[in-house]
Amino acid sequence: MKVSAAALCVILTTAALCVPASASPYASDTTPCCFAYISRALPRTHIKEYFYTSSKCSNLAVVFVTRKNRQVCANPEKKWVREYINSLEMS
């Protein structure tokens, strides 16, 4: 009986030590991923902010947020996208 109680204690201690150090699950990252980019430039006056997609996404993208809170995916390699980002950073 003492052997099985000791074995159970060892198993529970081992299991507790094997828990990952990070308590936050991957699902807590709410940044959207983009699977396609907008084909043409948006009017600059419609954009209020931007952010980059998570590094966990398969495609790197810039997400522009419009004045109507619509999120639009754009290719960060396009010249107009870089210009819009620079403009938003300056303001």
Swiss-Prot record:
GO cellular component: cytoplasm; extracellular space
InterPro entries listed in its UniProt record: Chemokine_b/g/d (IPR039809), Chemokine_CC_CS (IPR000827), Chemokine_IL8-like_dom (IPR001811), Interleukin_8-like_sf (IPR036048)
Signal sequence residues: 1-23
Compartmental location: Secreted
Disulfide bonds: 33-57, 34-73
Keyword Signal recorded: yes
Keyword terms: Chemotaxis, Cytokine, Disulfide bond, Inflammatory response, Secreted, Signal
A biological process term (GO) from this entry: positive regulation of receptor signaling pathway via STAT
Protein family (similarity comment): Belongs to the intercrine beta (chemokine CC) family.
Known function: Chemoattractant for blood monocytes, memory T-helper cells and eosinophils. Causes the release of histamine from basophils and activates eosinophils. May activate several chemokine receptors including CCR1, CCR3, CCR4 and CCR5. May also be an agonist of the G protein-coupled receptor GPR75. Together with GPR75, may play a role in neuron survival through activation of a downstream signaling pathway involving the PI3, Akt and MAP kinases. By activating GPR75 may also play a role in insulin secretion by islet cells.
Record-given protein name: C-C motif chemokine 5
